[in-house]
Amino acid sequence: MDKIIKSISKNGHFRAFALDSTLTVREAQERHQTWPTSTVALGRTLIAAQILGANEKGDTKITVKVLGDGAMGPIIAVADSKGHVKGYVKNRELDYKKASTGEVLVAPFVGNGFLVVVKDMGLKQPYSGQVDLITGEIGEDLAWYFLSSEQTPSSVGVNVLLNEDSDTVKIAGGFMLQALPDATDEEITEIEHNIKSMPSIATMLTRDEPLKTMLDNIYGDMEYKNLGEFPLAFKCDCSKERFLEGIKSLGRQPIEEMIAEDHGAEIICQFCENKYEYSEEELKALIN
């Protein structure tokens, strides 16, 4: 089971999340049938959305949009505070790796553009923040968002490692570390050093207690408190009824055309690839 551990330093100067999102990203890859570069980019965006969702409470929904001008096209992920996330990438069929190392290349195919974060708290107007993509690697871009839009110095790491023989998802996860208002410059320097010198996310996620290992490495000698473990999962809230309401909102003429030309309708959810079919009778009931 995927999960996130939330923590805070005992002096209250830092907080950190550590996530294992392997099953989440694996399910996204299987549902969307993405190729390696697209899998890694979508996976990183899903993990980023899970990090942002874990920051929230109640019924708040977070939408993360990576809007670059590269061949990848838009990457969209939607998460809630309960650990659920869904998402898609426009171009699923990108497969580029460094010839020397086999490393999957992401940034060149994301390109230049924007990271947009939309918070929907159920109020009249959702909150929206936007920053330039500074690397296109997504983790660094999310850290830049926290600093620019929320004035919170942060370090974010997100990683998706694929199996070399099959390009399926081997491991996926990440972390977020934030300096809180009372953090001193010396403490921030110490934490930065810890993060720069710790093993890769993929390496830590293969350890016996992966998320504890990640937090131990982030905090180093600083004592911290575990605030709890929470489950994570790929979960879409689409339904046949919800899409039927969408069809109804189109109005009489488009529905009559569906009946006359196709004798029904088929809708595939963009976020999860679930397919919904509507009979001629179901469509007629919408306009009678």
From Swiss-Prot:
Taxonomic lineage of the native organism: Bacteria, Bacillati, Bacillota, Bacilli, Lactobacillales
Compartments where located: Cytoplasm
UniProt keyword Ion transport present: no
Function: Redox regulated molecular chaperone. Protects both thermally unfolding and oxidatively damaged proteins from irreversible aggregation. Plays an important role in the bacterial defense system toward oxidative stress.
Entry protein name: 33 kDa chaperonin
Disulfide pattern: C236-C238, C269-C272
Keyword Cytoplasm tagged: yes
Lineage top rank: taxon: Bacteria
Transmembrane segments: none
Name of the gene: hslO
Main location: cytoplasm
GO biological process: protein refolding
Family: Belongs to the HSP33 family.
NCBIfam families tied to this protein: PRK00114.1
Alphabetical UniProt keywords: Chaperone, Cytoplasm, Disulfide bond, Redox-active center, Stress response, Zinc
One MF term in the entry's GO annotations: protein folding chaperone
CDD domains (alphabetical): Hsp33
Posttranslational modification: Under oxidizing conditions two disulfide bonds are formed involving the reactive cysteines. Under reducing conditions zinc is bound to the reactive cysteines and the protein is inactive.
GO cellular component: a single term: cytoplasm
